[in-house]
Regions:
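Tubulin/FtsZ superfamily GTPase core signature
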Residues: 4, 8-173
Length: 173
């Protein structure tokens, strides 16, 4: 089931959800918020700047420059190139598959719940977020996907690409 919340940004919804968790009793959080690609990265950067420190934020991207420009201290470059996916989900999917061990290691620190946020319709979020969700679920982590899809004016091709990504993501959350 896909639900849309037209009056609120997905990052604001996630901020409100996370604020309800309160402070953990220990320093290492069992909750990870993982931003994948440009859209997911923007959402995580926003939440991080809002001052939520009760979770561990992670950025995953095929674009090394986007990772370096972020204030979020934990990042994972997907693939070896670091030049982005060029709006090609299959390229991002391959980069994520190439980085499976790094993804597993990122999730292996006691993570019990993962929120994976991504913008669908481009390359990295659409292609890599489902791979990260699959790994998370295979590790027994409660995995929640929070994604956006393009506006109608962005065109049918981009929307179709986004819906393919949502369908793939839904298999793992």
């Amino acid at each position: 089931d896909l639900h849309s919340f037209p009056t609120r940004r997905s990052s604001d919804l996630l901020v409100n959800i996370l604020l309800d968790f309160g402070k953990p009793e220990k320093e290492d959080s069992i909750i990870k918020v993982i931003g994948v690609g440009g859209g997911g990265g923007n959402a995580v950067n926003h939440m991080y700047r809002e001052g939520i420190h009760d979770v561990t934020f992670v950025l995953c991207n095929t674009d090394n420059q986007a990772l370096n420009d972020s204030p979020v201290p934990v990042h994972l470059q997907l693939g070896k190139e670091g030049l982005g996916a060029g709006n090609k989900p299959e390229k991002a999917r391959a980069a994520a598959e190439e980085s499976l061990e790094d993804i597993k290691q990122m999730l292996s620190d006691g993570t019990r719940m993962a929120f994976i946020t991504a913008g669908m319709g481009g390359g990295t979020g659409t292609g890599a977020a489902p791979v990260i969700a699959r790994v998370s679920k295979e590790m027994g982590i409660l995995t929640v996907g929070i994604v956006t899809i393009p506006f109608r004016f962005e065109g049918d091709r981009k929307i179709d690409q986004a819906l393919d990504g949502v369908e793939e993501m839904a298999k793992h959350v």
